[in-house]
Every structure is written in C-alpha cells, then in structure tokens.
Regions:
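Noncatalytic alpha-helical scaffold of FAD-dependent oxidoreductases
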Residues: 1-190
Length: 190
C-alpha cells in the first residue's frame, strides 16, 4: 500500500513497467512465504518415511548438522542439505535411500568430508546427505578367490565409515601394505 502511494503515474510507460515489477515482487514474496509450509510438510513426510528405517535421532533437520554437511575439504558451498541421515547399520541404508527417492530428494553418500572433488556438495536444497561415519565394522585380511584372477587375493571387509588408518594397520598386521595418502590417513574414511 505504501509503495502504491509513492508511484509516479505521470509517465504511463514507466508506470506500466513499475507495475509489472511490483507484480513480480509480490508473487516472489508470496511464493517465499508459502515455501515455509511446503518445506515443513516435506519434512514431516520425510521424517515419517525415515522412521521405519532408522532411529529418530539419526534424522537431522537441525541447522548445525545441515551446515556441517554442506561442503567437503574443497569448502565449495552451493546449497545446504535438506536433511542429514546418520544410520547405525548398513542394513538401514536401502530403506533410507528408497525413502529419499520417494520423497523427491537427491541422495549424497558422505564419509569424513575430506575429499577434494566436491562430490558431496549439495547442488539442490532438496538433498539428503547419508553420513556413513558410524558404519565402522572391520574384518581381518582373508584370502579370496575372485573371478578372472588366478589364485587367492588378500581381501579386507570394511564398512563405509572405517577410518583409513584402521585399514592400513589391519593390512600391516597381516603382512600387507594398504597404500594411503598419509596427510589424511586419520580422517579419511573408506
């Protein structure tokens, strides 16, 4: 209303342009205001979908978790993720991924965030980051037969959240070398 009082209608062409600009601005403000209800509704639906696959504490819509997962070592930031999921077991992941897809969320798997590729940086505000840091099971080196390879090959089972130093140490104990980038061996996750 105050803007209308200040409009100069003496130049009809200019006034028409101002009118269009005001129309676009009002529409943008209404869309922005409506986005809060839409985001809240999506959060409710997503939380309900995630609830049958993981504990509620593993579903993080809070600002701290979301900002902490907005980038990797590149410090390149595009968007803040919609939600951060931190499953307790690998068995939870298929259901969480399915729930993300059904909710229209882009899925981003993330380890320790030490990468320099930007591959874990959300490019849309509707991204779900699945943090694998709690998935820490580590087996021992065992010989395995692999298709197309003669003889047995030393293998080591790890879950996605195992810190590389632990893998390197397990290989060393078994008499093998697991080559790593030592600058981040204590932070980098398999």
């Amino acid at each position: 209303a105050d803007i209308e009082k200040r409009r100069d209608t003496s130049d009809a062409g200019r006034d028409a342009k101002v009118g269009k600009l005001l129309e676009f601005a009002r529409s943008a403000v209404l869309d922005f205001a409506g986005s809060f209800a839409r985001v809240d509704a999506l959060r409710r639906r997503a939380r309900k979908a995630f609830a049958s696959h993981t504990h509620d504490d593993n579903v993080c819509f809070d600002a701290y978790a979301r900002v902490a997962h907005a980038t990797d070592a590149t410090d390149w930031r595009v968007e803040i993720p919609f939600v951060v999921l931190a499953p307790d077991t690998e068995d939870e992941i298929p259901g969480l991924v399915r729930a993300c897809i059904e909710s229209g969320l882009t899925v981003i798997p993330r380890g320790g965030g030490t990468g320099y590729t930007g591959s874990v940086v959300p490019l849309t505000p509707f991204a779900a980051v699945i943090n694998t840091e709690k998935l820490e099971r580590l087996g021992s080196v065992e010989p395995q037969s692999l298709p197309g390879v003669a003889g047995h090959v030393p293998t080591l089972f790890t879950e996605a959240g195992v810190v590389t130093r632990r893998v390197e140490e397990a290989a060393h104990r078994a008499g093998f070398v697991f080559a790593v980038l030592f600058a981040v061996v204590d932070e980098m996750i398999v």
